[in-house]
């Protein structure tokens, strides 16, 4: 399985800022948007291109364009929505599919509650957006949904990932590519990533208990 931990200095700087427990909701949200753009840039680096001739200011000019790739972004509710604006800024023509799963805090298993996928997934590159890859359960359930709907080319974009989740994903979906700003140390006994970011959804939407 292809796993890319993006070591670009800007990515590492911003993920470090994101780990600050004192960071405001506004600051957290802005950094998530910026990291979404930077990570999507890396995740789309292997798209095929083709030559195209078009009118230029001094006559015909040959340029490179994406070779027929259609992209759907798949934010996992609700935290994945925080990454969506940054990725759409890079790929404004992308279709958006939405998946809602929540983790049962006792079993740590994902429970689906919403699914709205764009059509013709077999023709599209699907980019799953979620700040955290922890146990991998939510991600694998999302991939199962996408594959049942016909998706063949799937990538996951995460701010941080746990080794346990990566290992679980590789055992079930080795064809999926993963792009992340950081591979963290481990999961605690409650299934949370350490050192992690805290609850990314609460920090993005400002719903932390004070």
Curated annotation (Swiss-Prot):
Entry keyword Nucleotide-binding: yes
Lineage top rank: taxon: Bacteria
Known EC number: 2.4.2.9
Binding sites annotated in the UniProt record for 5-phospho-alpha-D-ribose 1-diphosphate: 78, 103, 130-138, 199
Catalysed conversion reaction: UMP + diphosphate = 5-phospho-alpha-D-ribose 1-diphosphate + uracil
Biological or metabolic pathway of the protein: Pyrimidine metabolism; UMP biosynthesis via salvage pathway; UMP from uracil: step 1/1
Task of the protein: Catalyzes the conversion of uracil and 5-phospho-alpha-D-ribose 1-diphosphate (PRPP) to UMP and diphosphate.
Name by which UniProt lists this protein: Uracil phosphoribosyltransferase
């Amino acid at each position: 399985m292809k796993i890319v931990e993006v070591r670009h200095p800007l990515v590492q700087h911003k993920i470090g800022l994101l780990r600050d427990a004192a960071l405001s909701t506004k600051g957290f949200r802005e950094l998530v948007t910026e990291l979404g753009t930077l990570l999507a840039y890396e995740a789309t680096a292997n798209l095929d291109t083709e030559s195209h001739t078009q009118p230029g200011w001094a006559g015909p000019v040959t340029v490179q364009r994406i070779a027929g790739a259609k992209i759907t972004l798949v934010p996992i509710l609700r935290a994945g929505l925080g990454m969506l604006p940054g990725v759409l800024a890079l790929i404004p023509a992308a279709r958006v599919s939405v998946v809602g799963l929540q983790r049962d805090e006792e079993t740590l298993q994902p429970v689906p509650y919403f699914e709205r996928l764009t059509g013709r997934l077999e023709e599209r590159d699907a980019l799953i957006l979620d700040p955290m890859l922890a146990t991998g359960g939510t991600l694998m359930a999302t991939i199962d949904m996408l594959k049942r709907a016909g998706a063949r080319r799937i990538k996951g974009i995460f701010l941080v990932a746990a080794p346990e989740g990566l290992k679980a994903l590789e055992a079930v979906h080795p064809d999926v590519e993963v792009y992340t700003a950081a591979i963290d140390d481990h999961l605690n006994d409650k299934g949370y990533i350490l050192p992690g970011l805290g609850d990314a959804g609460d920090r993005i939407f400002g719903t932390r208990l004070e």
